[in-house]
Swiss-Prot record:
Keywords of this entry: Cytoplasm, GTP-binding, Initiation factor, Nucleotide-binding, Protein biosynthesis
Residues covered by the tr-type G domain: 414-581
Composition bias type Polar residues, residue spans: 97-108
Protein name stated in the entry: Translation initiation factor IF-2
Natural source organism: Rhizobium etli (strain ATCC 51251 / DSM 11541 / JCM 21823 / NBRC 15573 / CFN 42)
Annotated stretches, region: G1: 423-430
G4 as annotated region, ranges: 523-526
Location of the region described as G5 in the Swiss-Prot/TrEMBL record: 559-561
Length: 916
């Protein structure tokens, strides 16, 4: 209790919490007790509520939070709290100049979950009175600022209203002009679009506020000042929370008017519905519809961002089509289908949705994804179902138009004949060609045998003849076949002293398969043992009928050594060419056949080609097999550079990207892109074939290991490098024939060109031997091979190469085990001797018995033991052998189960080395 009525100092006798009594209109900053002697400053605010109707307007005292608590000095004992007494609330001056005295807040019982209210004393201290005075002064200052702000807002709204009316008039004039221009569409649009009617009367809520001056519904003003919006939306720093926390009534009315609906708190009668033509918003309206921080606080959820003009037009067009049941016309397209295509790409080519294609496949019972690959048949079925036509193409179509171009008969002129010289090895083919060319090619060939296809051109009586020399060795079968395919006439060379041989018969078959006429040249008639008539008789057995025997095949007896009758042979060739009437068109793109190909270290890839049609010139782009290139140079058989190569001329072509296969066709194309496309297609085919071949041979690892263990096949890996493609092909074919059921040659890599470091690395990884045929390893490769311990073998003759590989493969064969029967002995008695064990007393009944030989113990015709003899004695002496009819004693190594009546068979084992 207090000491006097004038003294405001509080004093208590016991421990009691000191608080201030909350007032209905207290505003300002007070101190609130936080417990344990802590306090904090709290701003006390007052909120206003809008009355439902003017007649129900009553002053309502908002529930104010508990007043801040001042903690008193702790007393020894707590004191009983006094009953709460109300104090008169301070007067707050409103902007209108009238004081509004709010009634005191009635006491409400505390709820169960509320904290107990602190006890408020009857008197305030001077500090608390000063705080209340300051809060009252600040409230009055904020009220004055609010009054000034509301006056400015009224002026702003008046200016906006004027601008809005001007924009409305301008918009009405513009709509009238647009309506006149769209009279044809206005009727359909007015009938299709739903009429926009006025909203129903809105119920008056407690938030609604009477408006004495309602405004007519109108669109939003065309322009609004951003500074005015910000001033209206942002409260002043000292403004009361009641002003900051609620929207301005004038803004609510403006927003209601801008949306075309009734203002808040007004009851509007429904107007009759009338059609309204949807117009696109102006740029200013569209800009005003954007979401900003200012409009988000003022407009809230009422301000939605507008759509673009194009989206609105599409929406109207879609709605109009749906109203008049307009359907789009189906566009049928020609779909180009390759051999395989993905569903996504197919849908794009049909201009259909991939989802529709997937749905169709699901109806057909196939679950697929857009990225799945389908074949051309299924793609054609899908395209037909969707109403499109199909044009099927193949990857091989890239080769169309480069070969077999039809020529006009008037453009064809006579060309030289292409003659292939064929026959058995060492029958004098190359020597005959040397005699015709007046050159010595045989001296340049290793071993005196031809191992390449040589192409030359000679002239006889002003007419040119192209000769192709083929090897006669059995390994070069493919070369002879290629020579027969690229030729017009075949000269079959048969030695008069050696008659018809296997390769002679093979050459006859190649010529007949190619459909070319044969001229028989019986060579070596200068020898004493020559018998030309014997050769003619043997040729009859192979259906080669010469003229002297009543047939149509020309035959000439020649001698390559003396040059006898060579002119008659050339005349026979020209006569046969005249009968064939060989012609070609030189004024077209060139095409022909690759005779041979090699990788030259100085010149790169070099291909010997035979031009069969057209004229080949430097600078042209050619495709040969799976390689292509631009012709850098043309070199003839004499080493001269040519400006062009007419039909039937053999030339060397420089400039290819790689070495083509011998026998590949070549053709000139118009561009590098076309050449690259054809080359990539052929390379892809080659890879697919190789992969299919390897997968068919290899199988799974488990199957391969099982096969290797069951069959015992051993492999001899090889890396083969040769000078030309044809020689490599011949070597591979010869080595493949060496294989048996137990051992075979596995060619890890083969190619044309010198031996490089990469070949050494490959041989090291695969544990293979390296074979070089007419090539050598460079210095780096030799050093690398020496460091890695890789053996490189060089060969110039295919005979030696095949023989060495055959011998090496024979070493992989397991030796043959051969048993030789020596004799039999019958056990008569079994003795048990100390320190020796059981000894069988036997009689040799057949052959003889040798010490150290293998023995078998046979009981009832069943072998029960196989081993070696430990001792062989006759009487007490060790003997090396016992002949038939004599008795002896025998003991086995590590075996003593011998019985009377058993038979001992003695044999000798020999291991014999096998060869292929």
């Amino acid at each position: 209790m207090t000491d006097s009525n004038d003294d405001k100092t509080l004093s208590v006798t016991g421990k009691k919490t000191l608080t201030l009594k909350p007032s209905g209109m207290s505003q300002g900053t007070v101190r609130q007790d936080m417990g344990r002697g802590r306090t904090k400053a709290v701003v006390v605010e007052t909120r206003k509520r809008r009355p439902m109707r003017p007649e129900d307007e009553k002053p309502i005292t908002p529930a104010t939070p508990a007043a801040p608590v001042r903690a008193a000095e702790p007393a020894p004992a707590p004191a009983q709290a006094r009953p709460q007494q109300s104090t008169p609330a301070p007067r707050i001056h409103q902007p209108g100049g009238q004081a509004n005295q709010r009634p005191q807040q009635s006491y409400q019982p505390p709820r169960a979950n509320d904290r107990p209210r602190p006890v408020v004393l009857n008197h305030l201290s001077p500090e608390e009175m000063d705080a209340r005075r300051r809060a009252l002064a600040e409230s009055q200052a904020r009220d004055a600022q609010d009054a000034i702000r509301r006056a400015e807002e009224e002026k702003r709204r008046a200016a906006e209203e004027a601008v809005r009316k001007a924009a409305e008039a301008e918009e009405a004039a513009r709509r009238a002009v647009e309506e006149a221009a769209r009279q044809a569409e206005a009727a359909a649009a007015a009938a299709a679009e739903p009429a926009v009617t006025a909203p129903a009367p809105a119920p008056v809520t407690a938030e609604a506020r009477p408006n004495t001056s309602p405004r007519p519904a109108a669109p939003a003003p065309a322009a609004r000042r951003p500074d005015a919006d910000g001033a209206a939306a942002r409260p002043a720093p000292g403004a009361p929370a009641a002003v900051r926390g609620r929207r301005n009534d004038g803004d609510d009315d403006d927003r209601g008017a801008s949306r075309g609906g009734p203002a808040r708190g007004r009851v509007v009668r429904p107007e009759p519905a009338k059609p309204v033509t949807t117009r696109p918003k102006t740029d200013e309206e569209r800009r005003r519809g954007k979401l900003t921080i200012t409009t988000a606080d003022v407009d809230g959820e009422d301000a939605g961002r507008s759509r673009s003009l194009s989206a609105m037009r599409r929406r109207q067009e879609k709605f109009r089509r749906s109203q008049v049941q307009e359907t789009r016309e189906k566009i049928s397209r020609e779909v180009v289908l390759p051999e395989t295509i993905t569903i996504q790409e197919l849908s794009q080519r049909m201009s259909e949705r991939a989802v529709d294609v997937i749905k169709y496949l699901m109806k057909e019972g196939q679950m697929m994804k857009p990225g799945d690959v389908i074949d051309a048949d299924l793609a054609e079925l899908i395209a037909g179902e969707f109403g499109h036509t199909v044009k099927r193409v193949s990857e091989s179509d890239v080769e169309l138009g480069i070969f077999n171009i039809a020529d006009v008969e008037g453009d064809r002129v006579s060309r030289p004949p292409v003659v292939t010289i064929m026959g058995h090895v060492d029958h004098g083919k190359t020597s005959l060609l040397d005699a015709i060319r007046h050159a010595n090619v045989v001296a340049g060939e290793a071993g005196g045998i031809t191992q390449h296809i040589g192409a030359y051109q000679v002239e006889q009586n002003g007419q040119k003849i192209t000769f192709i020399d083929t090897p006669g060795h059995a390994a070069f079968t493919a070369m002879r076949a290629r020579g027969a395919q690229a030729t017009d006439i075949a000269i079959l060379v048969v030695a008069a002293d050696d008659s018809v041989m296997p390769q002679t018969i093979e050459s006859i078959n190649h010529a007949k398969a190619a459909g070319v006429p044969i001229i028989v040249a019986i060579n070596k008639i200068d020898k004493h043992e020559a018998d030309p008539q014997k050769v003619r008789n043997q040729l009859l057995q192979h259906e080669v009928f010469v003229e002297s025997m009543g047939g149509e095949t020309l035959d000439v007896e020649v001698s390559a050594k003396t040059g006898k009758n060579l002119d008659k042979l050339l005349e026979a060739v020209l006569l046969q060419a005249e009968i064939l009437d060989l012609k070609a068109n030189p004024n077209r793109t060139a095409e022909g056949t690759v005779i041979e190909a090699q990788l030259d270290r100085g010149r790169g890839a070099v291909a010997t080609v035979l031009v069969q049609n057209g004229t080949l010139k430097p600078g042209q782009i050619i495709v040969a097999g799976d390689v292509w290139g631009r012709v850098r140079a043309l070199v003839n058989d004499k080493g001269e550079h040519m400006k062009e190569a007419p039909p039937a001329m053999p030339v060397e072509v420089l400039g290819l990207s790689g070495t083509p296969q011998a026998g590949d066709k070549f053709a000139v194309v118009e561009s590098e892109s076309r050449a690259r496309e054809i080359s990539e297609y052929r390379q892809r085919l080659a890879r697919d074939k190789a992969a299919a071949r390897q997968s068919g041979q290899r199988g799974s690892l488990e199957q391969m290991m099982t096969q290797m263990q069951s069959t015992g096949i051993k492999e001899f890996p090889l890396v083969i490098k040769g000078d030309v493609q044809g020689s490599i092909e011949a070597i591979a074919g010869a080595l493949e024939k060496l294989g048996t059921d137990e051992v075979r040659a596995r060619i890890v890599h083969l190619g044309a060109g010198g031996i490089t470091e990469s070949d050494i690395s490959l041989a090291e990884a695969s544990n293979a031997a390296i074979i070089g045929f007419n090539v050598r390893a460079n210095a780096q490769a030799r050093q690398f091979a020496e460091r890695q311990g890789i053996e490189i073998r060089y060969y110039n003759i295919i005979y030696d190469l095949v023989d060495d590989v055959k011998a090496a493969m024979s070493g992989l064969l397991s030796p043959e085990r051969r048993e030789t029967f020596i004799g039999n002995a019958e056990i008569l008695e079994v003795f048990n001797i100390t320190k020796v064990g059981k000894v069988a007393g036997c009689r040799v009944v057949e052959g003889k018995v040798e010490r150290g030989a293998g023995v078998r113990l046979i009981r009832n015709d069943v072998v029960v033991h196989e081993g070696k003899l430990k001792t062989l004695k006759r009487f007490k002496d060790e003997v090396s052998e016992v002949p038939m009819g004599q008795e002896c004693g025998m003991a086995f190594e590590n075996y003593e189960d011998m019985r009377v009546g058993d038979v001992i068979e003695c044999f000798r084992v020999e291991h014999i080395t096998r060869t292929l």
